[in-house]
Amino acid sequence: MRVPDFTHVVLVVFENHEASSIVGNPDAPTFNALGRRYARLTRYYAVAHPSLPNYLALVSGSTHGITSDCTDCIVGTRSLADTLTAAGKTWRVYAEGLPRSGFTGGSAGEYAKKHDPFLYFAAIANSRAGRDRVVPFTRLSRDLAAHRLPGFSLIVPNLCDDMHDCPVATGDTWLKEHIVPLVHSPELLGGVVFVVFDEGTSDVGGGGHVDALALGPTVRPGSSFSKTTNHYGLLRTIEDAWGLPRLGLSAKATPIGGIWKG
């Protein structure tokens, strides 16, 4: 399946809800309106429990045998950050509640390292330049205003806004306030925003059947992708868009297709 050569890719990750608790839920009007306007990936699955292995899978194609939300474990293999950098692409993590760039602690207020996967890779954790690409969420508005949105952005809401500790309605409001304006930003005219959940509450597919959306001007309005996919398929889609090497199990995954314009 052909994937567009996106100008920008933004990945937003919410927490711990099955698709059945989002799709059609009156407390999630923004999720459902966006799903109707753009594209919903109707058979999208998380790959593991708990949170951390899913985040690692999203950015490296493997859970690396990690089965906990450890905060001191380190992975020595490549991640999407490495392949992006090698291809001349820029990347950044915008983490809500992160005290400052370079912070590597396990938690701070409503920020949780377990939802910030790049800091688990040695090439980033042991590099000042790498750590400095993980920044507080407040940096996003400045980067947009300065037309400095990186090629790839991972947006990590805090433990309340991602629905981990707060109701669905809270996350939906956050999506409306922060991500809808981003979708409509001039920076995203040739880009895409993926909105997914790290895991569900069941073991279906390894980590539950979760809601997933593809948003933006490159998406065919009112479309859907109904083939079975997961975090590895999403990673494969990003890799194919930019001709990046396929990491881990993304090599065996099918890219997301049938929802793109042109």
Where do the protein language model's features map onto the residues?
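N-terminal pro-sequences and low-complexity stem/linker regions of secreted or lumenal proteins
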Residues: 1-262
